[in-house]
Amino acid sequence: MDFSSTRMLAQGLFVFLMLSTMAEATKPRTILVGDSQGWRAGTNYTQWAIQNSPFHINDTLVFKYPPPGNSTVTQSVYLLPNLWSYITCEFRGAKLLGNASEGDDEGFKVALNESKPYYFASAEGNSYDCLAGLTKFIAVPSTRSTTS
């Protein structure tokens, strides 16, 4: 094989690897909220969300937490309707996504199907954690880019 053939082969391999990487980058992610620790009281999920962003349309969040009786603090997950509800930890009008027992085993999944803010929070403990800025976060998925 001469130099030009080797060079063309190397360039072709490079293009293939780049396209493979781009295709991988365009796949929706499944993201465990809180990583290996899961969804638990007293945790700053805003910091977690910053570290795990950007979120993209069709990504899926997985919420896992111990069932009642295995934890000193019961957990739940709500989707709050707007920023004001999120800031004030007002759960009227919120949608319960997962009650105290639904985070067990494999947890439950929430698909981020729209380009809009998703306001997640726990209402447990009279919303103490939420009011302290804990056990809540915002995810704003964007369109996944196919170019670098």
What residue spans do the PLM features occupy?
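Loop/turn positions that initiate beta-strands
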Residues: 57-58
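Short beta-strand segments of immunoglobulin-like
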Residues: 44-54
